Amino acid sequence: LLVTPATLCDAPSMQDFLSSDNRTQTAKHDYCTQPVNLAGLPAATVPVKLSSRSLPLCIQIIGRYGREDEVLSLAKFIENNVQFPRMQLI
């Protein structure tokens, strides 16, 4: 298993997101996840911390082809041990 950041930063504000074209936003925010998706590898994203703006920061767990069970097992372990706060949905 390989653990990487899921993104390079927390989520942009709507104004920041709309200030760049889709290709630029994709390059910035999908940098870590896109290659894994294109390779067809199993992966899961798990929140582990809140940013200074109280937005989730996540890690990505990448597994071997066909071993979703390993990815989900580690994701569950991290989820149970990190105790990430539940967010209030508006």
Segments (PLM) and residue ranges:
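Structural helix-boundary/capping segments
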Residues: 38-90
